[in-house]
Amino acid sequence: MYLSRLPPRSIPCRSINQISRVVARSSKSRLEFVGSYQNSLTTNQTRCLRPFSSTSRSQLRDYFPEADHEHIKKTEAAWPHPNYPKEQMLTNISYAHRTPKDFSDRIALYLVRFLRFSTDLATGYKHDPVTITENGEKVLKKPYRMSERKWLIRMVFLESVAGVPGMVAGMLRHLHSLRRLKRDNGWIETLLEEAYNERMHLLTFLKMAKPGWFMKFMIIGAQGVFFNSMFLSYLISPRTCHRFVAYLEEEAVLTYSTAIQDIEAGLLPKWTSPEFRIPDLAVQYWKIPEGNRTMRDLLLYIRADEAKHREVNHTLGNLDQNEDPNPFVSEYRDKAAPHPSKGIEHIRPTGWERNEII
């Protein structure tokens, strides 16, 4: 490329002075920026404990900061969370599977297994179980693949679609009640509360991880497919949909149980660090007492919620979809006998049979 040479040109002294002042100001601002940037990095390293993010550490911020209003001090949850004693979460909650009894149950189970395979593939989930040797030592057969970051990726993706079934079912039952000019017998509130609870799980994890554009794209696609599939399926067979959600919650209980075992085995050091703090959102929603605010405690609460959803949907799948009342908000004649409730003191992992409660 040919460049023409221009004759040399003298620069006035006044221009030289102006240029010198500009350079001095820019150098000073640059030094101030570097200093503030280093301070922000140091602050984020000590204060920001978000293990997974698609952005650089210096760009991390509160994913949905609380707005400061002139007249409103605080907005409480629409559905206050019931109290879960820690002893009950440890003794009453565990993985359980309901054996399919008819063709509808088998269809629901096969769909859940396919969805589980697809989700594992999408989130990169691959867990190597811990084996116990004769000496009682815990040994991994293969190099461990799950980390805090991978667990959060999986949890964010799962909870982003877990709130869909309850909202779809509640919406359709609401419209069904309007068309029939009849009461719904309490189903709508429980289904909407379930969707709300799943959304609180998502918001809690978003306080620890900010998804990138690829995760957001996956969530949009999964939500679009899942919502429309649930919408059409619930119109055809509500009972099959409730069984499907119950089997899905069985997998959720298994997932969180595995994560809790990993924490207890010391495989997730960032979550067992004394500096780690769970989000204040979780403390306020679950009313977590002081001294029980570790990541393990948080996952115990979330696992208990998933176990409750498992019980609710297995039970609703056993009832008459049009006539039976919601047993989880009903008042029983014999209050001393075990019966469905919002708590976990009498939780039934595979659901209550119709002849036990109606």
Curated annotation (Swiss-Prot):
Its cofactor is Fe cation. Its EC number is 1.-.-.-. It is found in: Mitochondrion inner membrane. InterPro entries: AOX, AOX_sf. PANTHER family: ALTERNATIVE OXIDASE (PTHR31803:SF3). Belongs to the alternative oxidase family. This is Alternative oxidase, mitochondrial. It comes from Blumeria graminis.
